[in-house]
UniProtKB/Swiss-Prot annotation:
Function: May play a role in growth regulation. Is associated with G2/M phase arrest in response to DNA damage. May be an intermediate by which p53 mediates its role as an inhibitor of cellular proliferation.
Subcellular location(s) of the protein: Nucleus
SUPFAM superfamilies: Cyclin-like (SSF47954)
SMART domains noted in UniProt: CYCLIN
This protein's GO CC annotations: cyclin-dependent protein kinase holoenzyme complex; cytoplasm; nucleus
Molecular function terms, GO-annotated: cyclin-dependent protein serine/threonine kinase regulator activity
Keywords: Cell cycle, Cell division, Cyclin, Mitosis, Nucleus
Annotated gene: CCNG1
Listed name of the protein: Cyclin-G1
A Pfam family the protein falls into: Cyclin_N
Amino acid sequence: MIEVLTTTDSQKLLHQLNALLEQELRCQPKVCGLRLIESAHDNGLRMTARLRDFEVKDLLSLTQFFGFDTETFSLAVNLLDRFLSKMKVQPKHLGCVGLSCFYLAVKSTEEERNVPLATDLIRISQYRFTVSDLMRMEKIVLEKVCWKVKATTAFQFLQLYYSLLQENVPHERKSSLNFERLEAQLKACYCRIIFSKAKPSVLALSIIALEIQAQKYIELTEGVERLQKHSKISGRDLTFWQELVSKCLAEYSSNKCAKPNVQKLKWIVSGRTARQLRHSYYRITHLPTIPETVP
């Protein structure tokens, strides 16, 4: 138990954390299946880590385009990886699988009025398959994930860990740890298949611990240690994933990182499609950079 948390809000957050920790291992990708994808050769016939990562980047682009919540993106990635870790998917079918997972996540987390029509989603994504194809693939995905769409995600842990840490920070220092920056870092990690092998709690705390260490927020170090102990995360695991997160973020900000196809991000839309799309579809059309810290 985290003894210093005595307020009602803190106790509610802690109760939520305990519930997430209890459910964490349910509805996660099969690690053995992810390893098979990582070891596959890129011969155009088998699913590879590179193809998976590019598909996730496309889903992130769609999330930004429609202005959907990060939890929607997180759930879409979870569904995609759960399916890919169970099934042998041919590269030519990946687009339909990815969009089906995305649509399931959208319908599960977003308000009904914000859910796009399947026809619009396919047009915006520039795929050639039909609505019937998408619906058939949705059913296949649902069957393979045992109709369990909801899952515990690293984003949920990131939100809770951040809120719990903020409870123990003096009011004048509450803005020091930038949640938007942490959120962007998590999105970058989602675009690498290796992080789907990490427990959601470990990935979330690794990102926070790394940021606190990098920005020298000494007053938050003890709070991270308490969260680590409460979540039963070993120091070895935390260090291992921190190093991988650090490497990922370094590559993300360098020329080595394979950026999403800029041309595709322009989303060439026909006049007819543009007239049919809802106004809310034009909220965001670019990928965000990881925000700088406030001096």
